[in-house]
């Protein structure tokens, strides 16, 4: 007798670590017989993997949960599961259950591996199921992962964060830093390369802290050096790096390791020493600029991207001018810019000197405009150069063109045959646009 097919629709908010968590949970569900749904309406299970780092992501989750009421009305047996960082906040899991009766299951960031058992509880009629756990030191290994790409893979190397920036909820919802064993990371990457994956991105809230908790004398630079020797692997990327912990040894490995790409995401957050100190970032603007100079001296073609925040409590016009000055001095290839939002449970949320919303709005628009000009100039400087591009497939916006990534993590589009997907090609850049490069394959 043929088993009834079951479908899951997964919706992910937030960072790359959340993307990986969704791939992992989807892999676990696949082991239960669930297949990816083509649409939300086809789903027997809706899995919403949430983020609470920024207010906008949290608000989108609330809106989505409200919209599911009609789907549950049409399909009462539909299971709605909410996971991720949002339920991990104190009291929020209970709030989700109270505000949204459509939700059958809530779990957090530390017990994703328990998802199949929790789903079975729901199917047995015990709903709602509240499955949020507090963090412990264990990092489960060997769990199935259903990756979106067969070419590039996320590989977490460290979970959690010990930094406690005054605006950030991550240490509270992800827990303290917990590194994976180096052999486990190397074995996973070797397995991916053997399966045909050509690029891995090593993930962590702060990859530069890797190994400190292991007591094995290994750090992130040493891990990178080991992974550079994996046969069949073409490229290694990593994110995110805390500027305070970016060592000269790591710079040396990035410069010398053939497979480590020349792209570094280096969140500055602000350019004012006063603001950086209040943020508890652990470095000054002078420290940051010195680090950038050392990176560029060792890796001349490096592309640098960053995160920047405006409107942090107490930020003055002079502080904001310092941030604009930092952006101009560094010359980022790209910047992810954000308006400060108070996050529940963080020190900065309770400070009295909150910046008015209209001031935040003006500053973010000015920052975006400055970075647009710099980013466009950086991309136009690529015109005439020949770049190595890993072809991903048809462009999402121009299906008649192929799209891929350079080693410096720039999107490159060009004419070509679909059969080039998964290959490395040399592309001469003809035009540098704001968000991508356009060119032609060199014969």
From Swiss-Prot:
MTTase N-terminal domain sequence ranges: 6-124
Catalytic activity: N(6)-dimethylallyladenosine(37) in tRNA + (sulfur carrier)-SH + AH2 + 2 S-adenosyl-L-methionine = 2-methylsulfanyl-N(6)-dimethylallyladenosine(37) in tRNA + (sulfur carrier)-H + 5'-deoxyadenosine + L-methionine + A + S-adenosyl-L-homocysteine + 2 H(+)
Segments forming domain Radical SAM core: 147-377
One Gene Ontology molecular-function label: 4 iron, 4 sulfur cluster binding
NCBIfam families given in the database record: miaB-methiolase, MiaB/RimO family radical SAM methylthiotransferase
Subunit structure: Monomer.
Role according to the record: Catalyzes the methylthiolation of N6-(dimethylallyl)adenosine (i(6)A), leading to the formation of 2-methylthio-N6-(dimethylallyl)adenosine (ms(2)i(6)A) at position 37 in tRNAs that read codons beginning with uridine.
Name listed for the protein in its UniProt record: tRNA-2-methylthio-N(6)-dimethylallyladenosine synthase
